[in-house]
């Protein structure tokens, strides 16, 4: 929902395999983290099943508010052996993990956690991650729960502390009351963990809100957001911004901000010691003012197979770009700003091999899939909500501000369900409800969720919505992810329920 409420192809496929390759042969079918992998490509390594039938369901919220749902639910994960890891909001601000057999939906185990979501108008979700035979889960006090063997009904559980176990044990209450993880967890190919945290008060060792790294051997380090940005007014790692890694794992990307509706930077850091490689202050490509950073966004950096980095922000002045924001675009070390996309609000772009779109006649090896809503009732927008495939290396006039050059539209798809909330806007349709979309290169399609309560397959070969299944009656809600499991089951969240869909 809007804030106001060829050889080139061969190279691409090789590079994408490098990006999404697993840490062992057994990981190749897994959905490991937010947007699939540490580059947030959203590209499945398994062909999705047809959207024919709902196999099973799991509530992801046992304290659903009345009316619209201003909550970001954490992405489900799927192991290579088809265990589905579901973050569940158990109360008004309490969470747990529920693990299911991916085929039958049978519950295998539950894991409690003391994690509490940081305050934001759109409540942030809890974002676990998988590495090897370990599941990492956010806990309170900035701690991370480690559960061994998540495919088994029981597993050894331990804790990690980025600031040291002895420090925690010296004053547990001080850390539990003040330190909160505020992003999904990201693991690299060696099992090192990265995440943002808030320090909302004093601790014995003087923690300040920033970025944590826990090495595979359990040792931790951290750096404050103010220090990393070189700006004393920067107060946090951007809310819900999952850190991303370059294809070779050497560079870590994360955004920082001065708080809700403030300004911010995108950082490129040495992934081993968190030293700054580069930082860039994020600006609106039309006005050249500071871009608006919103705590209600779940946008995270996407890293392309060529190393280019994409990150979504809101416009400034707001909402002069019709609450669409911008998808900012940089080279690997952030030294060059490239063509922006015309939509960036609460969206993590997915990577699409150019060969999946037969109508494409350009030269880019890969394209981007993004939300492309056109919110009715906001500035000059008309309610013609779309999703889009964009060429990151070709430009055209922006559809809202023609004087600004943006990524060229390759194909777009208009929503299908009329929006009764906007009867005075001809052709207005319900929003696409997606913050990270699963791309299926085997069926050449993208799995997209809508606020009309339906899940769609967008066929990129014909530019049609070739399959649809009803999940709910439709509701306005904070944007949600889609996922493809290790047996091809499709997962989507609609009206606070996770549905498992397949043949």
Where do the PLM segments sit?
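Bacterial N-terminal signal peptides that target proteins for export
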Residues: 1-12
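Bacterial N-terminal signal peptides
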Residues: 11-22
